[in-house]
Regions:
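Charge-patterned, long linear interaction tracts outside catalytic cores
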Residues: 129-155
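Helix-centered, glycine/charged polyanion-binding patches within enzymatic domains
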Residues: 59, 64-132
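Polybasic low-complexity intrinsically disordered regions
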Residues: 1-77
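Catalytic-loop motifs flanking and including active-site residues across diverse enzymes
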Residues: 43, 109, 113, 139, ...
Length: 155
């Protein structure tokens, strides 16, 4: 797919994208593989349903790309509190309450997990083709990341 970025340049991509849901300690809970052209917010509901089957959590913390009424309602239907950064579409940005802002800052753990998966566990250099092979390659990285995070928790 191709789109224009904020500076007006065309940005292209091909292949696949891994959507990862992590616990607040950085351990991956659920993963979905999608086409690289699919917007992140379209994977949020299926990913949250998989996570809800595996763990019990209170908060769903997401960045501004996931700001939609449907996603807020879905989070509430699962009994979760949605902490989704507001995307100010032709309006003002809504700020979090102080306690929610502290909880929202925990999102850096998920960003760190994604970065570690790319940098340390091979997700940045996938040299296989086909969805099944790509998913297998990435799942070995997710497995290694999970084991590493669990070992760090023991220390």
């Amino acid at each position: 797919g191709t789109k224009c970025n904020a500076q007006g340049y065309k940005v292209s991509w091909n292949g696949y994208k891994l959507h990862l849901d992590t616990a607040d300690c950085g351990v991956p809970i659920a993963a979905l593989l999608s086409s690289a052209s699919m917007h992140d917010s379209r994977a949020a509901i299926p990913l949250s349903l998989i996570s809800a089957q595996r763990v019990t959590n209170l908060y769903d913390v997401m960045d501004a790309a996931y700001c939609s009424f449907e996603l807020h309602e879905h989070c509430r239907s699962l009994g979760h509190v949605p902490l989704i950064d507001h995307n100010p579409r032709k309006g003002e940005k809504e700020a979090f309450e102080p306690a929610d802002a502290v909880r929202y800052n925990e999102r850096t753990v998920a960003e760190r997990s994604n970065a570690r998966l790319k940098d340390e566990f091979g997700a940045n250099n996938v040299r296989v083709q086909g969805g099944t092979k790509v998913m297998g390659h990435l799942m070995f990285g997710v497995l290694a990341l999970s084991a590493d995070q669990l070992m760090r928790l023991r220390q």
